[in-house]
């Protein structure tokens, strides 16, 4: 069972991801709507670390590359968190 402080931290991290990876931005970049938009956002939700460390260009590029994979039925890429820290 997670401690109260850990739960609060996880909640804040999820809110930060929601703030950057929001429906308005994803809809604008992908032109997806409705259930398809929801499915895409669930499948390709970025990690907290990637969301925190990436700039706007990298973040939008991630969404576009994810759309390419989504439309071809490919799974999301697995990001190696250690590589993000080395940059």
Predicted regions and their residues:
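Short beta-strand and adjacent turn/loop elements
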Residues: 1-87
């Amino acid at each position: 069972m997670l401690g109260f402080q850990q739960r609060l931290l996880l909640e804040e991290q999820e809110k930060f991801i929601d703030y950057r990876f929001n429906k308005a931005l994803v809809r604008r970049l992908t032109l997806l709507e409705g259930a398809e938009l929801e499915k895409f956002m669930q499948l390709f939700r970025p990690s907290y670390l990637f969301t925190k460390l990436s700039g706007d260009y990298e973040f939008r590029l991630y969404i576009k590359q994810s759309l390419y994979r989504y439309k071809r039925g490919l799974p999301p890429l697995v990001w190696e968190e250690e590589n993000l820290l080395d940059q």
